[in-house]
Every structure is written in C-alpha cells, then in structure tokens.
Amino acid sequence: MKRLSFFLMAAALLWGAYSALAGPMDGLLSDMGLSGKGAGDDSRIAAGLKEALSVGTKNAVDAVSRTDGYFANQAIKIVVPDKIQNVANVLSKLGYREQVDAFVLSMNRAAEKAAPQAASFFVDAFQNMTFEDARKIFEGGDTSATEFFKSKTQDKLYGAFKPIVSSSMDEVGVTKTYKEMVGKYTSAVPFASVESLDLDHYVTTKALDGLFYVLGQEEKKIRTDPAARVTDLLKDVFGK
C-alpha cells in the first residue's frame, strides 16, 4: 500500500511539473520557430532558400565571369562614369572613340576576371539565415532572397572584392587605358581639367551591382520557372 501511495504521489508531482513547464516551453519553441507543425515547414523552407541561393549564386557567377558576361549584358554593362562622361563625349567627337571603347571594355573585362572569386564570400549569409528570415523571404517578392543576401554581404563583400578587382584592373590595363584617354583629352582641349575618379571603387561597386542583379534574375527563375528548379528540394519548396 505504501508503494502504491508513493507511485501516486510521484505521478502527481510529475504532472504538476509538466503543467507548470508546458506554457513556457511552448512559448520558447515558438520563439525559436520550432513548435508544432511549423517547425518542419520552416526548416524545409530555410533549406530550400539556402539551396536556391547556392544554385543561383553559381549560375550568376558563371554568367558574369565568362567573356562578355558584363560587357554584352546591357543591364549590367559597366559604362563610362558620370564624372568623366563629358571627357568621353568630347573625345568621341574628336575621333578618339577607339580609346573610349577600349576603356569601357577594360573595365568590364576586369569585372569578368574578378567575378569567380565572389562565390567564396557568400557562405556566411547561407549559414546565418534564421527560420524567421526564411519565412519572410519565402513569402516576399521575386527577389527577396537576393535582397536579404545583399543586405547581409555587400559591405563585407565590397571590402574583400575590391583588391581582387584592383588586381584584375591592373592585369587587363584599365588604369593604362584611362590615362591614355585622359591624355588625349587634355592634349585636344588645352587648359581642360578632369575630375578625380576612384576607378577601383567605381568598378568594384558596378561589378557587385551587376552580380546581385543577375542573382536576382536567377532567383526569379527558380520561383517562377519549374525548369530552373534543378534539385528535388527546390521542386518541393518552390513547386507548391
């Protein structure tokens, strides 16, 4: 009889402990995005978005890093900076269009050469995506994952990417063609001045803008085109 009383008392204590903890634990799990049915959904969505970004990043980097990846794509082509557009216009009228074209081509070649290095800087944003981030992105617009990605990586990516772009610019002769172009201008237009320009900053910024633009296009494809969902996970998450 004493043993039965002991078990009944233990059961009562355990039930009381469960009742006391049930509310707070449910709240904690909910805050973590892990409660009930939504936990599996959120983890699946997060995994799908990470995979979409992974696939999209690879496709975007492949697209822009090939020859003419920037130069032949009018949406992301790096053109003459606004600060020296007047210089380019004057030179073109004076018969030096070839020098202007060479300068534009060299900037785009530098971006194409540097682009493959960008992929290695994207891993952190994949790993740090929370379930809450994933849910908002999934329910957002056609490029919401890209915008999230950009907000999380752009500053860090710029700092890491700029030296690579600068090195590429030296290799393809951007600075050389720029100086030649400015030299032609100052010779043709006596006493003319040319506004100072940070070419490294300009090309790096434009190269990243172009990369994120193409990544956004890849995200749109995955969201809207079944043929772009190249894995079972992408088909599962975005096919519903």
Spans of features found by a protein language model:
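Bacterial N-terminal signal peptides that target proteins for export
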Residues: 1-8, 18
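Sec/Tat signal peptide C-region and signal peptidase I cleavage site
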Residues: 15-22
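N-terminal Sec/ER secretory leader and immediately downstream segment
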Residues: 24-106
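A cross-kingdom marker for long, charged
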Residues: 27-33, 200, 207-240
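Residue-level signature of catalytic and energy-coupling elements of molecular machines
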Residues: 60, 130, 226
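Mid-length scaffold segments of soluble, non-membrane domains
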Residues: 96-168
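An amphipathic alpha-helical core segment
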Residues: 164-206
